[in-house]
């Protein structure tokens, strides 16, 4: 059971430096803020619009924001695939925060949360131009490069907690 500490979000973790990972609930004001970040960083540069089908799919997923001193700086969507397996998607960092370690902080925070929840394997489809970022976080490239939303992507997998069977 989730504890709803706020109308639109659940505080997951907070550190003394003002960084906080929050689960954000669909239809909340905070969710709309996450959508704006995702649109600005992932869709607008490609001239992509938001579709109704994507909105319906979003209702089935979990949404997280990384906040620094109450300002949203990053977001990630978590999709449960199988017991112990999750897919990360729509990973975004606000443009002014890019190149400052925010993406790494976001990934570590979500991985730590998911490990506590029993996830043993993470998957994601990385744009090829940022795959090295995930390489540095110990994600492994799997399979051939493929096209998604008109861009080359590669599937990447990470086994959590040293679990070597997946």
Where on the chain are the PLM-derived regions?
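Conserved GNAT acetyl-CoA-binding A-motif
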Residues: 107, 114-127
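A conserved beta-turn-beta hairpin within the catalytic core of GNAT-like acetyltransferases
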Residues: 80-91, 98, 148-153
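Conserved acetyl-CoA-binding loop-helix of GNAT-fold acetyltransferases
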Residues: 93, 99-112
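A short beta-loop-alpha structural element at the N-terminal edge
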Residues: 18-34
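Short loop/turn motifs at secondary-structure junctions and domain boundaries
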Residues: 54-59
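Conserved catalytic-core motifs of GNAT/GCN5-like acyltransferases
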Residues: 123-125, 135, 140-155
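Conserved beta-strand in the GNAT
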Residues: 65, 71-79, 87-92
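Helix-loop element at the rim of GNAT/NAT acetyltransferase active sites that forms part
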Residues: 24, 36-50
């Amino acid at each position: 059971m989730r504890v709803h500490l706020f109308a639109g979000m659940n505080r997951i973790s907070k550190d003394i430096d003002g960084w906080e990972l929050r689960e954000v609930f669909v239809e909340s004001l905070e969710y709309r803020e996450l959508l704006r970040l995702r649109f600005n960083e992932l869709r607008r540069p490609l001239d992509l619009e938001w579709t109704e089908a994507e909105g319906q799919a979003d209702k089935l997923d979990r949404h997280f924001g990384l906040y620094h001193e109450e300002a949203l700086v990053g977001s990630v969507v978590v999709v449960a695939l199988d017991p112990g397996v999750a897919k990360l998607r729509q990973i975004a960092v606000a443009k002014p925060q890019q190149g400052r370690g925010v993406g790494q902080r976001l990934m570590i925070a979500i991985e730590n949360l998911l490990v506590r929840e029993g996830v043993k394997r993470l998957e994601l489809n990385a744009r090829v131009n940022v795959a090295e970022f995930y390489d540095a976080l110990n994600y492994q490239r799997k399979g051939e490069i493929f096209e998604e939303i008109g861009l080359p992507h590669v599937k990447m997998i990470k086994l959590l907690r040293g679990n070597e069977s997946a």
